[in-house]
Amino acid sequence: MIKKIITTCMGLNNGLALFGVGLIAIAILVTYPKLPSLDSLQHYKPKLPLTIYSSDGQVIGVYGEQRREFTKIDDFPKILKDAVIAAEDKRFYDHWGVDVWGVARAVIGNVMAGGVQSGASTITQQVAKNFYLSSERSFTRKFNEALLAYKIEQSLSKDKILELYFNQIYLGQRAYGFASAAQTYFNKNVNDLTLAEAAMLAGLPKAPSAYNPIVNPERAKLRQAYILNNMLEEGMITLQQRDQALKEELHYERFVQNIDQSALYVAEMARQELFEKYGEDAYTQGFKVYTTVDTAHQRVATEALRKVLRNFDRGSSYRGAENYIDLSKSDNVEETVSQYLSTLYTVDKMIPAVVLEASRKGVQIQLPSGRKVTLNNHALGFAARAVNNEKMGDDRIRRGSVIRVKGSGDTFTVVQEPLLQGALVSLDAKTGAVRALVGGYDYHSKTFNRATQAMRQPGSTFKPFIYSAALAKGMTASTMINDAPISLPGKGANGKAWNPKNSDGRYAGYITLRQALTASKNMVSIRILMSIGIGYAQQYIQRFGFKPSEIPASLSMALGAGETTPLRIAEGYSVFANGGYKVSAHVIDKIYDSQGRLRAQMQPLVAGENAPQAIDPRNAYIMYKIMQDVVRVGTARGAATLGRSDIAGKTGTTNDNKDAWFVGFNPNVVTAVYIGFDKPRSMGRAGYGGTIAVPVWVEYIGFALKGTSVKPMKAPEGVVTNGGEVYMRERMTTSSDLALDNSGIRPRPTQPARRAVPNENRRRAESNTAPAREESDETPVLPSNTGNNNRQQLDSLF
């Protein structure tokens, strides 16, 4: 009887086993054909960040959520490959995708635990999960994972599978793949890892957070020891190597991408262009973008701008703490402060610090290095009054305040970032390539790019476009214009009269067009615009690249009352510099894919080749010659310190000295400088273009043109010289004889018309207006009438 029972049971077991095998076979037959294609593995394209470079190959920007560096499996060191295999899959080179013995152990453990608590995922199974499956803990998912692992093993070599794993696996700290992890945790190339470091990294795949050596050093050390012991058991290392690795003290160094900080505004401009072209793929396809800027030029431009902004801010009162963090609820103040400071940048040698204690005796701060320093009243300097000053509210210096200090060793002083801002744009005049661009004092504190986004009044820097229109309309550099006061009843604010003036209160009477621009005479600019017509001027000035919205349809145009950007102004002046051609500013030169293949290359419009002719080359040349006088004897005399005879330019200052400009150029380079507060307010007596913008330009262009030969613009065909003045040939005997009074081009009524004597007029104007002083351009409130009708209405007002 007992024998029958045993026989029956054995039969039942065999039957059940066969039944189970049958079910598994059916499941495999049903599921296997539905498994996903392996195209994504066979043509692996990891998510690689967008990297932006300067023209000289320096990294200026990296964008992308995943920090990854694709590396071929043969380029990984053997100690790392051994460590990972010892940790994750000892029989990797022996199984067919699934480790049967490992599965058996895991099944027993899960049955004992009453659910899926652990797996026996091989490296191949992990590849299947990472690329295709979720992290759900279920038997169904594990079954699909096993089938997919088998399919992968049938299609790919072991080394290819290992390569996929080594590059795709997430290892914490935004690091994907072991090459990236080596940089992230040890700031090393993967081939420079020691055995101890390799074993530590090999412990991360199991649980990147739990075994993070920076956050959980003790657990990470236990995991490292486990892996080293496995390596010893597998004969991968010797006992001596294991013991030495266990004793090795590891030094963790957070990876900091070596990004040149001077070109961050340019990098952001390039990023925006890539995003517009490729969308989110811009951040995952590993594009390498080479820009047109040179890092040496960028650094000089940045420092030139910062120096002027710092000097202006010197003497200002302390405006208060930069920020505040609540330390009252922190269990570990030092760690809380360290983590916060790690998110901030040192700007212009101004180091961020957090106040730990604040009293009359002094202020204790913690630096990003973790070092604590006490500042006495002398070190606090102008910030001493802010210590626990309740009147300053949240801006006071107290425990938790974020401040800036400068210094080294034991000597630090409190400093603050300037409130005044500015921008610099330098273009290749012939192609529009941006050679340097600075959008503000510091990108990290304010990402707003004043070079491209700040719509500000250009002031007198806009006048050359109107003067160019006048030349196109028939005037010459020696046309006489009356520099006298003008009053327009009812055209000012609140219906009052508009009484524009020259800022120095001086009026020179009849002077030449050349002299008027050299001395930046507001009254002359207004009369010129009245003569040529507002409508004509609007249409003409669009040739320089300005949008209609940037050109006001009123006489205020003559004083630069419209709003535009420094970049647009620089583009406009490039027309004068290159002989009359319209070129487009651009920052991207070439785009490569992750394999180093050229995907796109800028084909710029080049002056004299394929760029459209915006204005008559003779017009551009005459304007260049006139603006050389602005540098020689006019409002930009500071630029003459360079000692170059090929420089020309124009300054600009708006109402109450709220905006200051200088745009200078030679036939090869155009550079515009803008200075002003983000919330417009007066800069005071120091806020003229000639006094605050010109010094920035001089320091930068002195470097940019160092070693280059002096080559003034050559006169184009059709330009003649008479009496020291330059003319278009056909106008030598016509309009150059005339003078412009209040109503247009005609002989002055007070005396017969005569040919102007340029040298005589120039000397007279210089004596009447010297020393030239920058004009502050009054902005009127005028109706939007345009063209000759407007001029005829104004004729009766004089």
From Swiss-Prot:
Region (Transglycosylase): 50-218
GO MF terms, alphabetically ordered: penicillin binding; peptidoglycan glycosyltransferase activity; serine-type D-Ala-D-Ala carboxypeptidase activity
Subcellular location: Cell inner membrane
Swiss-Prot/TrEMBL catalytic activity: [GlcNAc-(1->4)-Mur2Ac(oyl-L-Ala-gamma-D-Glu-L-Lys-D-Ala-D-Ala)](n)-di-trans,octa-cis-undecaprenyl diphosphate + beta-D-GlcNAc-(1->4)-Mur2Ac(oyl-L-Ala-gamma-D-Glu-L-Lys-D-Ala-D-Ala)-di-trans,octa-cis-undecaprenyl diphosphate = [GlcNAc-(1->4)-Mur2Ac(oyl-L-Ala-gamma-D-Glu-L-Lys-D-Ala-D-Ala)](n+1)-di-trans,octa-cis-undecaprenyl diphosphate + di-trans,octa-cis-undecaprenyl diphosphate + H(+); Preferential cleavage: (Ac)2-L-Lys-D-Ala-|-D-Ala. Also transpeptidation of peptidyl-alanyl moieties that are N-acyl substituents of D-alanine
Classification via InterPro entries: Beta-lactam/transpept-like (IPR012338), Glyco_trans_51 (IPR001264), Glycosyltr_51/Transpeptidase (IPR050396), Lysozyme-like_dom_sf (IPR023346), NA-bd_OB-fold (IPR012340), PBP_transglycosylase (IPR036950), PCB_OB (IPR031376), PCN-bd_Tpept (IPR001460)
Gene3D superfamilies linked to this entry: Biosynthetic peptidoglycan transglycosylase-like, DD-peptidase/beta-lactamase superfamily, Nucleic acid-binding proteins
SUPFAM superfamilies given in the database record: beta-lactamase/transpeptidase-like, Lysozyme-like
Keyword Transmembrane helix: yes
Compositional bias (Polar residues): 782-798
Family recorded in the similarity comment: In the N-terminal section; belongs to the glycosyltransferase 51 family. In the C-terminal section; belongs to the transpeptidase family.
Protein purpose: Cell wall formation. Synthesis of cross-linked peptidoglycan from the lipid intermediates. The enzyme has a penicillin-insensitive transglycosylase N-terminal domain (formation of linear glycan strands) and a penicillin-sensitive transpeptidase C-terminal domain (cross-linking of the peptide subunits).
Protein name: Penicillin-binding protein 1A
Organism: Neisseria flavescens
Protein's gene: mrcA
